[in-house]
UniProtKB/Swiss-Prot annotation:
Protein name as it appears in the record: Thiamine biosynthesis bifunctional protein ThiEC
Lineage top rank: taxon: Bacteria
CDD domains, alphabetized: TMP_TenI (cd00564)
Residue positions binding [4Fe-4S] cluster: C829, C832, C837
Catalyses which reaction(s): 2-[(2R,5Z)-2-carboxy-4-methylthiazol-5(2H)-ylidene]ethyl phosphate + 4-amino-2-methyl-5-(diphosphooxymethyl)pyrimidine + 2 H(+) = thiamine phosphate + CO2 + diphosphate; 2-(2-carboxy-4-methylthiazol-5-yl)ethyl phosphate + 4-amino-2-methyl-5-(diphosphooxymethyl)pyrimidine + 2 H(+) = thiamine phosphate + CO2 + diphosphate; 4-methyl-5-(2-phosphooxyethyl)-thiazole + 4-amino-2-methyl-5-(diphosphooxymethyl)pyrimidine + H(+) = thiamine phosphate + diphosphate; 5-amino-1-(5-phospho-beta-D-ribosyl)imidazole + S-adenosyl-L-methionine = 4-amino-2-methyl-5-(phosphooxymethyl)pyrimidine + CO + 5'-deoxyadenosine + formate + L-methionine + 3 H(+)
Length: 917
């Protein structure tokens, strides 16, 4: 089993000058991580976790949290982190990828040589020693065995944790400056001194030969740990300055950490080449070579190097003025530069819709693009809002005392409407064209009046919560480009905040127009905060998931009051649209009893369970008007959930699905009456021949509100390929007017998608959206197709790669067989080779017969029966064995087909079979 520890060793860079020892029992009831965080802000340079009563699992969890705090403070490369006594826990944590730099052991703990053998040569090992004689014995240890010594106590203390770094001999003896210097001179290792240390000791300690001081209570027990740490650090530096101690010699005398040696056998030593595996037969060697080649292709296809080089985000400045202000709107687009056509001239760059957003530091978040637009209208107010509490992040956060990775970037006070709804629908209905509408019109290449009128009629929605000013306005409606949503979010089983932010960035890079955070696991509130502050696209949620987490997954404990509080919490954070399963009514639940797959919607099943347990109507339905009033204050759009959607083809279009749809039509009108934007969620599994019926039924029942569908999947037989089965249905339903398609990844029905699954799902659905736009005859929909076709015909290979939705996969597949750079200028690919390339042959035909005048002359002569020079050449080619064919007219083709059909029928054949047959 290989060592998974990914971090560089700190054995040559740790700083003992401000060494903070801490455990949960030292923090006076405050969260351990909060105290560590404050100590780091105050200048602590070394952290030791000491929790004598904790078991290995608890210590590992604490270590993970402390390592995350150090990372959040951007000090992972400057502040070392060790665990007291438990080398076994350090070993386990490092194998889990947690940044624990080493262990500190006492005289009664693990023998130093054993600790070094267990942890390997990269870990820090510290050792306690209280006397000069003990230090001299430690010097006899093999070179490279330990890295520093902890000596103490400086003062008599009744609390054992402060007696010394690693433990006390119980003698009660203390150290003075002379004794400290004696120990330091005797030691071959840097020495850190502590035990009852306070700020008053700093000048004396800094004047000795000690490398630094260690402390527990003076910081952990202080009213303000940050200020206490800062005072001590400044006192030390006033005498010592920034001068650092030296390091023990690094002599590698041990093997790597236990259990890694076997995994590293045969691996290359530093500075040497890896030894290739030898094979006993040619077949094994060829198979290994093929596998290695395929792995290289797969790795290249999973990246974005070529895409990032070719797809450049730019902005177009659009002046905008209305009664509330004047602005220069910087509207984004993607520019793809194209090469020249050989012998003809330059090709203009291709401009495409951009969803990626500007680059930013994820820890700081995006700039609030729309904040001035929102404030200048004068119809909102700032207010304090509800206070976030640990319950918002779930039961594990309550136990831990904090989220695993707190948001420390830009903070904002929540805003809400003052006197009237502040939705884009309200403005549109009052004839006000907002900056958001002009921004969208520029992105869509359409007239702004089309945007306003579609919003006013409810045929389009613009999800843009005033508390998410970072989002770039976009529109969802059948009159506009078909949009794509990507789902993500953690679960109770897997993922982290960093992974979810990375998935967000990855999804928008490849073209996601909106993202839904469907987190159901750890840190729901904080994960959402990170996502919102970093998202250039609207964010949707299902608030029921967080509400259920707050009642520890017991649906019977849900209430309207708890749900309302959760909705307001998310409105204040900036969620742009919310899935509300208000159409799952008590009387509809029995209709699902005989389904093959029952109720597959998580939100729908939660509400069905609540209705049955209480035998009451859904509080989402009975309090729907109150939800409308809340949404109108923040401009949050409804995504009316299809809680009774079919989860298999066998259940499609049944009474439960259609009954819920009728209720969603009623709720749409109720929301519109309060100027709240609405879109309707659609079915997930539908036979292909009923896809069109579903969209047409939704339009009729829900008054042309935008339809938002998951796929639909058109077969249930392809786990692992449901991004394909669903993209087929998505293209068809998009063709007939579905406004937004929710992607499906290869992991659908199988597990939580990772980064590569997200890319696969987004690309599949970008293709579906684009195909639907072409089928709808959307203006300019075929521009990209025409550009790439022209590049293909002209053998401009790089332009072909760059104009594709996934340049990295395209170039990886091409280079799989033709990797040489000259092949990217060749007039063939590996499919046909240089002699049989249809494009090359077609170019020769164009050279011979191209030009409008030549074409007209050929047609004229052929119609007149004249054997032109061109026709004579064609006949000569046939005579010489060159494959050719006479071109039949449409009439001749039809006549020939009829004749063949008659012959087939006369022989007893049947052209078509009935369903019974």
């Amino acid at each position: 089993m290989s060592n998974e520890y990914p971090y560089a060793s700190m054995r040559d860079s740790f700083d003992l000058s401000a060494y903070f020892v801490v455990g949960p029992e030292d923090c006076k009831g405050r969260p351990l991580t909060d105290v560590v965080d404050q100590a780091l802000h105050g200048g602590a340079t070394f952290i030791q976790l000491r929790a004598k009563e904790a078991d290995a699992s608890e210590l590992t969890d604490m270590a993970r949290d402390i390592a995350q705090i150090i990372e959040d403070n951007e000090k992972s490369d400057s502040v070392a982190f060790v665990i007291d006594d438990r080398a076994d826990v350090v070993w386990q944590a490092r194998r889990k990828g947690i940044k624990v730099d080493g262990v500190h052991i006492g005289q009664t703990d693990m023998e130093p040589r054993e600790a070094r053998a267990l942890l390997g040569d990269e870990a820090i090992v510290g050792l306690s020693a209280e006397t000069e004689s003990l230090v001299r014995l430690i010097n006899e240890l093999p070179d490279g065995c330990i890295d520093y010594i902890g000596a103490g106590p400086l003062h008599v203390s009744t609390t054992k944790p402060e007696a010394s770094v690693g433990g006390n001999d119980g003698s009660g003896k203390t150290l003075d400056a002379a004794q400290i210097n004696t120990i330091c001179v005797a030691s071959e290792f840097p020495v850190v001194v502590g035990g009852g240390v306070t700020a008053a000791d700093m000048a004396m300690l800094a004047d000795t030969k000690a490398a630094g001081w260690f402390v527990v209570s003076a910081i952990a027990g202080a009213e303000n740990p940050e200020e206490a740490a800062r005072t001590m650090v400044e006192g030390w530096k006033a005498v010592r300055g920034d001068k650092k101690h030296g390091y023990a010699p690094r002599v590698v005398t041990h093997t790597p950490a236990t259990d890694t040696q076997a995994a590293q056998e045969g691996a290359a030593k530093p500075g040497s080449e890896a030894t290739e595996k030898k094979f006993t037969n040619a077949k094994d060697a060829k198979d290994a070579q093929k596998l290695a080649k395929q792995q290289r292709v797969d790795i290249a296809a999973r990246g974005s190097k070529q895409r990032d080089k070719a797809h450049i985000r730019k902005t177009k400045s659009v002046p905008f003025t209305y009664q509330y202000g004047s602005y220069d709107l910087e509207v984004p687009y993607t520019e793809i530069k194209l090469s020249d056509t050989p012998g003809v001239g330059p090709n203009p760059p291709f401009h495409d819709y951009n969803t990626e957003g500007p680059k930013c530091d994820p820890k700081e978040g995006l700039k609030p693009l729309r904040l001035d637009w929102i404030r200048d209208r004068g119809d909102i107010e700032d207010y304090e809002g509800r206070r976030r509490n640990l319950e918002d992040d779930g039961k594990r956060a309550i136990k831990r005392g904090r989220a695993t990775k707190e948001w420390r970037g830009r903070k904002h006070e929540p805003m809400r409407a003052k006197d009237h709804p502040i939705t884009q629908m309200w403005y549109a209905r009052h004839g006000i064209i907002t900056p958001e509408m002009q921004y969208v019109a520029t992105r869509e290449n359409c007239d702004v009046e089309l945007v306003r009128s579609e919003l006013a009629a409810g045929r389009a929605v613009m999800p843009c919560n005033i508390n998410h000013p970072e989002a770039e306005p976009m529109i969802i409606g059948s009159a506009f480009l078909t949009k794509l949503n990507a789902n993500m979010g953690n679960s109770a089983v897997t993922s982290s905040i960093d992974e979810e932010v990375e998935k967000l960035t990855w999804a928008t890079k490849w073209g996601a127009d909106t993202v839904m955070d469907l987190s159901t696991g750890n840190d729901i509130h904080t994960t959402r905060e990170w996502i919102l502050r970093n998202s250039p696209v609207p964010i949707g949620t299902v608030p029921m998931y967080q509400a259920l987490e707050k009642v520890e997954d017991d649906a019977s404990k849900l209430s309207w009051e708890l749900f309302r509080d959760t909705v307001i919490e998310q409105c204040e954070q900036g969620v742009d649209y919310m899935t509300i399963h208000a159409g799952v009514l008590l009387r509809y639940v029995p209709l699902t009893a005989n389904r093959v797959t029952g109720i597959v919607s998580r939100g729908g099943s939660i509400m069905a369970d609540w209705c049955l347990r209480h035998h009451q109507e859904s509080f989402l339905y009975t309090h729907f008007d109150e939800l409308c009033d809340i949404f109108a204050k923040y401009d949050v759009a409804f995504s009316l959930g299809d809680g009774l959607r079919p989860g298999s083809l066998a259940d499609a279009n049944d009474a439960a699905q259609l009954s819920e749809l009728m209720t969603l039509g009623e709720l749409t009108e109720r929301a519109w009456a309060k100027d709240v934007q609405v879109m309707i969620e659609g079915p997930g599994h539908v036979p292909f021949d009923t896809v069109r019926m579903n969209i047409e039924l939704e339009k009729a029942v829900c008054h042309n509100a935008p339809f938002y569908t998951l796929g639909p999947l058109t077969t249930d037989t392809a786990p692992g390929y449901d991004h394909i089965t669903s993209a087929i249905g998505a293209t068809e339903i998009g063709r007939y007017g579905t406004a937004m398609l929710c992607y499906v990844t290869p992991k659908e029905h199988l597990g939580l998608p990772n980064k590569d699954d997200v890319k696969q799902g987004v690309i599949a659905y970008k293709i579906a959206c684009h195909a639907a736009d072409i089928a709808k005859h959307h203006p300019h929909a075929m521009d990209r197709d025409n550009a790439i076709s022209k590049a293909r015909f002209e053998f401009r290979w790089l332009d072909q790669f760059n104009l594709s939705y996934d340049p990295d996969t395209a170039i990886a597949f091409h280079d799989d067989t033709l990797p040489a750079e000259p092949a990217k200028m060749a007039h063939f690919c590996s499919m046909c080779g240089p002699k049989f390339c249809s494009m090359a042959i077609s170019q020769n035909i164009r050279k011979a017969f191209g030009g409008e005048a030549a074409q007209q002359q050929i047609v004229k002569e052929a119609a007149a029966g004249i054997d032109s020079e061109a026709l004579a050449t064609a006949k000569a080619n046939v005579d010489n064995g060159v494959v050719s064919a006479n071109v039949l007219s449409p009439e001749e083709i039809l006549a020939g087909m009829d004749a063949m059909s008659e012959k087939y029928t006369a022989q007893g054949g049947k052209l078509y079979s009935t369903a019974q047959e």
